[in-house]
Amino acid sequence: MSHQSDLIATDIDAYLKQHEQKQLLRFITCGSVDDGKSTLIGRLLYDSKLVYEDELAKVQSDSVRQGSVAGGFDPSLFMDGLKEEREQGITIDVAYRYFSTAKRKFIIADTPGHEQYTRNMATGASSADLAIILIDARHGVLTQTRRHSFIVSLLGIRHVVVAVNKMDIDGVDYSEDRFNEICDDYRSFATRLDLPDLHFIPISALNGDNLVDRSENMPWYTGSTLMNFLETVYIGSDRNLQDFRLPVQLVNRPNLNFRGFCGTIASGIIRKGEEITVLPSRQKSKVKEIVTYDGNLDEAYAPLAVTLTLEDEIDASRGDMIVRSGNLPRSESDVEAMLVWMNEEAMVPGKTYLVKHSTQTVPGNVETLAYKVDVNDLHRMPAPTLELNEIGRVRLSLSAPIHHDPYRRNRTTGAIILVDRITNATVAAGMILDRGTTGSHKSVWDDEVSTDDSSDALSTVTTEERAARFGQKPATVLLTGLTGSGKTSIARAVERKLFDAGRSVAVVDGEFVRRGLSRDLGFSADDRSENLRRSGHLAHTLNDAGLICLASLVAPSDDVRQKVGKLIGEDQFLVVHVATPLDVCRERDTKGQYAKADAGELSNFPGVTAKYDVPTNPDLAVDASTTSIAECADAVVELLKLKGFIK
């Protein structure tokens, strides 16, 4: 129901425009059985005068007939619409309710509290911005409270209100001590969850205490009422406006002169003229038009439904994804995810399911189950399978790559569901994890062999023989610095000098590696680590062949640089810091990457939106803003001579 306004009678167009511009907040109520979730929502609507008269009369009549509340009406009947729900006094399915106030529009999902309906609760929470977790003041924090809190955290809901309900009950009597006791108990559990914005409000849902109006029965509470908090909580920063993702739903071809790619923007912003990449083909083009039902736009953002036309004829179809060229998602056929199992039939490791991800559907199987989670204490337990409503971490092996982001970063492109191929039933909901997230799967760095296990150990040609043939010792020189510092220019100049001197040398350029070996990686810290690991392997292989390798890479993490040194061999690994100042790097930026990073269009960009660890003890430091490229190259050559790699 909409907020009543005088504009409805005087200027309906102005009212509709005002209503259209209100921000929408989606929230859920959850908690254990009979904690008062439906009662809370019903009373919230009633006290806000957002209930129709005929609906109120029906609820009052049903309250008298059922006798569910002594001496008054039962607000929960506004939400429990199923006959079984009203007869049993419980919520079975998710009930959605829309209403608005003068400040904001709301969509409420009233979720069931019984354990057997946990899957229904997870469904309601999947699109919520905020969660209200109810706790009965008599019973405190229960197992189902913990279960729902864990799911709320798992599904990335950042804003949580713990509403301690039934403060009016005999034995509680609006006690501040009891409220504080429950808050402390919940906090001790919540410290192990990712709940960054947590608030506590004492309420009586049946009587309306601290819902819309401040309670006279609890003068010791000086915080916000529930409605005031819902109207004012800031959710703007929750939106991902950096990573542009458009899963293609269909190709619109109404005539020979128009070909557009339709879909709902999952995240980010796109503008006319910007370069895009279509996955998985990796073809590039530029946005020609952004077409919508209401006319063409110069820019569009999530969650608008748009049709993009491109400057070039590119082959794309449903299941493909259009992204900004400088910000690619991961494209992988092996992913790790947390699953909420939602089917009566237990999960079967190795069984093939259909994995639905955005507009893409691919067959896949659960390769391994790392552990399941005991929601009562959050301990991880080994298990052969997942039963109904259980939660666990799995590794999925898919028949084709999916283009995804970690769920923590992008709730749309990080979400999957598993479907039974025979019954077509949804059996699980999954949240894709970031590479390297704590779990049973080791970091790929942990699997690295030592330099003693190099290909040289299997070759009939020894390192010494290669050194004698080439007249040099193999080495890798890592030139690290910010984008635009001059790393690659110096590497190419050194290559020329060494080659002209009769040396065998090769350059590993970061952009070259990104187009080949690391084309499936993005630019998160984990992806940069993996990119450097692969580049390190390439450099190590070149060293095994007797070559001097010049690796030009940003390599922002000091920890990862040290790992590369161990991978290659510290006795043949040199670090050159190209210490060109940031302001000079910005001036040299011909691709506009720094400007995009400043505008929030490029995430994890070293020097702007991500940290660059300045090498503390490099073998050489040069400043390409005060020293010419040729002089920098000479310094690198002298370093190689000083270390004995060349004469």
Curated annotation (Swiss-Prot):
Residues 110-113 are annotated as: G3. This is Bifunctional enzyme CysN/CysC. One of its GO terms (molecular function) is GTP binding. The keyword Nucleotide-binding applies. Keywords: ATP-binding, GTP-binding, Kinase, Multifunctional enzyme, Nucleotide-binding, Nucleotidyltransferase, Transferase. Its EC number is 2.7.7.4, 2.7.1.25. Residues 31-38 are annotated as: G1.
